[in-house]
Amino acid sequence: MTPKTDVRGEPFRLASRTRRVRAALLCVSLLLLLVPARAQDNNTMNTLAERYVRLVLAVGQHDADYVDAYYGPAEWRTEAEAQKLPLTEIASRTSALAQAIGAAKPPVTADQMTQLRYEYLARQLDAVRARVSMLTGTKLRFDEESKALYDAVAPTHTEADFAKVLAKLETMLPGRGALVDRYDEFRRSFIIPKDRLDPVFKAAIDACRSRTLRHIMLPPGESFIVEYVTGKSWSGYNWYQGNYRSLIQVNTDLPIYVDRAIDLACHEGYPGHHVYNVLLEKNLLRDRGWIEFSVYPLFSPQSLIAEGTANYGIEVAFPRAERLEFERRVLFPAAQLKSEMAARYYQVLDLVEQLSYAGNEAARRYINGEIDAKGAADWLEKYGMYSRPRAEQRVRFIDQYRSYVINYNLGKDLVAGYIESQGTDRWGAFARLISSPRLPSALTVDARR
């Protein structure tokens, strides 16, 4: 049988092949045009990012709390220290950089990470400008400040919003005297003895790290050391050193309760601040060369993501049933505490957790001038279940960090809403969030999609 052939013959096949070759060459030409354009866009962003880093370091010369971590070129820090630019000059340079960033907006065809990088850098710079304005004397109300610095505003609550929870606590902790005193008395049975602090924390850290490594790959050599300190307004702090290492300090001014072991080990370590900073350094600074991630300005939107993921990460690493079982089996015995009380202890703690926004209200009223320091401590006692020493410590924290307090509870709620909207793989969504330049305001938008 003679095979069938195209009646149009060989000239048609040649013409068709020629058209395909021309189309392929056109595609290659377009790609070659795009590569230099993308490289140019990246170079522009890198230049703008360097200016941003230098400005953050300059602000740090006027605000000791501002630069939380820096692991970029050492000479940039040295130059900032030598120059000590006046705040007026920093403000001028910040405005100029904002204009330059505005002119460098990537096209809508840019990939998601490029878009996120641009939006992140622009919003972080807005926070630099706001902080400089505050340092030069501008007074902002609580919500104005949190929006300017952290890209978020916490909901407002009244005394009535906490009344139902307080009534439930009254039932769970019956007796005479103020409710906060009864709560404080109840908690005394769960204080970790000072000579047991280190073994309890080590056990908690080992468990948090083990659980994190099952889901998140960390670079070789990552580690942190723990120090016990006094005289601080905070309970724990992660000082990221760069090169995948952290220094974690635990404040022992006040008694430390057994639940705080997992809280601090997760929040400050795995999968919290330590892992967050390690992944930013690895994935964004080293792998992509995004120099803006060599510096962490504390008073910026980055902090809401950092604190929110660190708090939500506790629940990701230790869902309630697993946490209760682990603490009964490991931490209570390590602390030489009675494990049979663990379930009741957490029933009470769960109620007190619902009062967390009372702390925001104390800070809001205090910063807005509606109450003084004593009034803020009184509010924390009555509506937040803070003992007097802890309430006074918290007021010192508010004096130092002001509206930063929203980053813990509002941050956790925003992160929880975002991650739970991403499907059932909480660890996967969590890892992606702490490896990308997301903004607080984008969490609610992305969660709705």
Predicted regions and their residues:
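Bacterial N-terminal signal peptides that target proteins for export
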Residues: K4-L25
